[in-house]
């Protein structure tokens, strides 16, 4: 059974601890409380 995708990952984002750094920008929060970042 595939586990449900994090909404962040579904939006092509990645979960980072702390702030997003270039070339990523913040698009939300992951389920685990980390920052959801996506490439520009």
Swiss-Prot record:
Family matches, as InterPro entries: Defensin_beta-like
GO biological process: defense response to bacterium
UniProt keyword Disulfide bond present: yes
Disulfide bonds: 8-36, 15-30, 20-37
Location of the protein in the cell: Secreted
Record carries keyword Oxidoreductase: no
Alphabetized UniProt keyword annotations: Antibiotic, Antimicrobial, Defensin, Disulfide bond, Secreted
Recorded superkingdom: Eukaryota
Recorded family membership: Belongs to the beta-defensin family.
Function recorded in the entry: Has antibacterial activity against the Gram-positive bacterium S.aureus 1056 MRSA (MIC=2.78 ug/ml) and the Gram-negative bacterium E.coli O157:H7 (MIC=2.41 ug/ml). Does not have antifungal activity against the yeast C.albicans 3153A.
Protein name: Ostricacin-3
């Amino acid at each position: 059974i595939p586990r449900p995708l994090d909404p962040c990952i579904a939006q092509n984002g990645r979960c980072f601890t702390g702030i997003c750094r270039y070339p990523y920008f913040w698009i939300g929060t992951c389920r685990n409380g980390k920052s959801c970042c996506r490439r520009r």
